[in-house]
Amino acid sequence: MKTAVIYWSGTGNTEAMAKAVAEGAGAECFAVSEFSGNVEDYDAIALGCPAMGAEVIEEDEMEPFVAEVEGFASGKTIGLFGSYGWGDGQWMRDWEDRMKAAGAEVACGEGIITQETPDDDALVKCKELGKTLAAV
């Protein structure tokens, strides 16, 4: 199956997670600013973004992209992942709810989050997410 891994990263933490997801999926990995394909052409999509500000996704590049994905998310399997520095992961719960409301199935039932730099356990979970998406 054709899988895309698309992310925004400010410090490199979410980028490391994205690379692990892509490795697990055997998929290409794109920073959202560099992605020029059509996400509708993919069977599964992994989206990564850290928590920003008051636990929201990055607003200048990732938010508009996610809004675009919502338009055709129905019936798609979408994996979500990201890092955070504070809070309790509310941004990810909100993101999961948003994708489900758009009709998507959230891979693995929930997004993968890690505080700050992803440790080995978080990277293993990211690779497993990639494998799940590749099997869609």
Predicted features and spans:
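FMN-binding flavodoxin-like domain, especially the glycine-rich phosphate-binding loop
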Residues: T3-A4, S9-F30, E34-G37, D41-V136
